[in-house]
Regions:
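Beta-strand-rich modules
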Residues: 316-337
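Short helix-loop-beta-strand segments that form the rim/entrance of peptidase-like active sites
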Residues: 67-91
């Protein structure tokens, strides 16, 4: 249907590798790169288009993560995928997301890696430690009832994709403290798109991991020299050490999520006009305990927690529900914890 960037009939083919989980084979965490590239004219399929950073870097990272993590056994399944047709309209992602929905796959989330190899920005800044995590605030698939509830109980920045972004931020700071993950409160860059979006459109969690500083002279450009500027997405401009770091960011987060128990479901919260906050949630198979998190309403990260075991309800005494946001994560016997679940229901007084 897209006649603007699809000028003739073509097959859209993704390359997919699935590492099946030992306990939850139908629960998937996904890492993706893209296997297409482009030059200045998106319909020019004849000119040399190396796409070294956009997006051979993300694809190489995905393959390397698969090489390393395939040596281990995880409770949840991991999908490593090269998505096609990104530059022409996110076709590969649309196809896989639709397939996952139709087959009833339980998608924990997708980590879309699109450009993870550039450290020198068009603004002249050089930075080999900072990277961005883009995420939408709430699912586009939420119902009018869910949207209305947020007006009264909060959650405007606490959708499933934002929780995945917070998990990646926290895990990176824990295992790679030299890195500087930066959460960006946008679906993607201003007016632009990436292959996590089709998964968001189907109601799945999805984020984009990418370099902090883009260089537009090396992105979507015909290879040429003009006004003393070398244009083109060439291999010489990719910083391999930086791409390695962001690949490691993906690997530690894939492993942490794949080793963790499922996130709590049916999390309910109460505490209106009380000096305490109450919680109830469904028991999670394989969880040793649970972390109850809270944060200031203006804080981007979960900053405080208390740990509980052998219960599916708890009250935080001396805390007023109005002044904080709350969430609950499952903790496995191995110490790995799930992504935080934001409350979706109320405990009636």
């Amino acid at each position: 249907k897209n006649k603007r960037r699809i000028v003739k009939d073509v097959m859209i083919v993704n390359v997919v590798a699935i590492q099946k989980g030992s306990k939850y084979p139908n629960r998937y965490i996904i890492m993706s790169g893209d296997i297409d590239s482009r030059v200045s004219d998106p319909n020019d399929f004849r000119s040399d288009s190396p796409g070294a950073n956009d997006n051979a870097s993300g694809m190489a990272g995905t393959i390397e993560a698969a090489r390393v993590l395939s040596k281990y056994t995880f409770e949840n399944s991991i999908i490593y995928v090269g998505l096609s047709g990104e530059e022409q309209g996110l076709f590969g992602g649309r196809g896989l997301a639709k397939h996952a929905k139709e087959k009833g796959w339980e998608i924990i989330g997708i980590m879309n890696n699109d450009m993870i190899g550039n450290i020198k920005g068009v603004d002249g800044i050089i930075d080999n430690r900072t990277f961005r995590i883009f995420s939408e605030p709430t699912p586009i698939t939420e119902t009018a009832k869910q949207r209305n509830a947020r007006r009264f109980y909060g959650g405007e920045v606490d959708g499933i994709s934002r929780q995945l972004a917070r998990f990646i931020h926290k895990t990176t700071k824990k295992y790679m403290p030299e890195m500087n993950p930066k959460m960006i409160y946008r679906l993607d860059r201003f007016g632009r798109g990436g292959h996590h979006r089709p998964f968001n459109d189907e109601g799945f969690a999805g984020i984009r991991i990418m370099e902090m500083h883009e260089n537009y002279t090396q992105q979507h450009q015909d290879i040429r020299n003009e006004d003393r500027i070398e244009y083109g997405d060439k291999l010489k401009f990719v910083n391999f050490d930086y791409a390695k770091k962001l690949t490691a960011v993906n690997a530690i987060n894939l492993a942490s999520i794949a080793w963790a128990p499922p996130a709590p479901k049916n999390v309910k919260i109460g505490g209106a006009v009380k000096p305490a906050v109450s919680f109830k949630w469904d028991s999670v198979e394989g969880a040793k305990g649970y972390k109850i998190y809270w944060r200031d309403t203006t804080s981007p990260t979960w900053d405080h927690f208390t740990y509980v075991e052998n219960t599916t309800e708890f009250s935080l005494e001396g805390i007023v529900v109005d002044n904080f946001f709350f969430g609950i994560a499952s903790v496995g016997e191995n110490g790995h914890e799930s992504i935080v679940s934001f409350p979706s229901g109320l405990i009636q007084n």
